[in-house]
Amino acid sequence: MLTIADVEFESRLFTGTGKFSNSQVMLEAITASKSQLVTVAMKRIDFKMGLDDLLTPLRQAGVRLLPNTSGARNAKEAVFAAELAREMLGTHWIKLEIHPDPKYLMPDAIETLEAARILCEKGFIVMPYVHADPVLCRRLEEVGCAAVMPLASPIGSNQGLVTESFLKIIIEQARVPVVIDAGIGAPSQAARAMELGADAVLVNTAIASSASPIVMAECFKEAVQCGRRAFEAGLGRVQTGAVHTSPLTGFLNQ
């Protein structure tokens, strides 16, 4: 069981709501994934037009919403988006995203740390999306973040665990849950993230852009479960050379 703040999650697969062909496919894929925490961008919600098309189906599915501040270019804009989410959606959970560069969507470490400090002081449950920087993740812990969400590779790239070496350090040092976010493009990559000891993964593009999102969601669900079980069972140590599994010459003496 995974615990973030005071909430327990049976599923360690978190999902998103973007890039699906329509809301029905989105809902069926999320249901198939068994995800219990689903992120939604505040910039996608038109509060003047009502919440039915996107949010009502998610609430009916019983998932917890994790609004995100995607589109914010600095700490001020991110704090505004978080406060709007709390007011309009009734949640103090927030996925903090600040990426002013529209090409690569790399998170701004300085603005993210400042926004995290402000939001934690305001009573938010903050889960920041950041580069795989062990020092930054420690600083975010210190200001009160409930979890950290280091990227595996650029958002939507499906490149996999490009930052694996740094993710290992973050997982080793973290005192809060580590959710690997962004760039996971295949179930095998999600399984690998879990084998490293990540507490959860967040997957959106790889599911939504699949030719069969519902089947792909099921695949990710199973991969995350297997990866976590493998981590808990204990993976064998990687050796630099061959190690025989049985005596090589004993039978010659019989």
From Swiss-Prot:
Tell me the active site.
95
The cellular component terms of Gene Ontology attached to this UniProt record, alphabetical and capped at eight, are: cytoplasm
Annotated TM spans: none
Protein origin, superkingdom: Bacteria
- Which top EC class is named for this enzyme in its record? transferase
Residues that coordinate or bind 1-deoxy-D-xylulose 5-phosphate: 156, 182-183, 204-205
Where are the disulfide bridges?
none
The record's subcellular locations are: Cytoplasm
Where does the record place a coiled coil?
A: none
Asked if the Swiss-Prot or TrEMBL record annotates the protein with the keyword Cytoplasm, the reply is yes
Q: Name one GO molecular function term.
A: thiazole synthase activity
Q: Name the UniProt key words of this record, in alphabetical order.
A: Cytoplasm, Schiff base, Thiamine biosynthesis, Transferase
Q: What's one Pfam family the UniProt record gives for this protein? A: ThiG
Specify the pathway.
Cofactor biosynthesis; thiamine diphosphate biosynthesis
Q: Which Enzyme Commission number(s) are listed?
A: 2.8.1.10
Q: What does the record list as GO biological process? A: thiamine diphosphate biosynthetic process
- Catalytic activity from the UniProt record: [ThiS sulfur-carrier protein]-C-terminal-Gly-aminoethanethioate + 2-iminoacetate + 1-deoxy-D-xylulose 5-phosphate = [ThiS sulfur-carrier protein]-C-terminal Gly-Gly + 2-[(2R,5Z)-2-carboxy-4-methylthiazol-5(2H)-ylidene]ethyl phosphate + 2 H2O + H(+)
Please name the HAMAP family in this protein's record.
ThiG
Stated family: Belongs to the ThiG family.
Which PANTHER family did the record assign? Answer: THIAZOLE SYNTHASE
**Subunit architecture:** Homotetramer. Forms heterodimers with either ThiH or ThiS.
Its annotated function is as follows:
Catalyzes the rearrangement of 1-deoxy-D-xylulose 5-phosphate (DXP) to produce the thiazole phosphate moiety of thiamine. Sulfur is provided by the thiocarboxylate moiety of the carrier protein ThiS. In vitro, sulfur can be provided by H(2)S.
Quote the protein name from its UniProt record.
Thiazole synthase
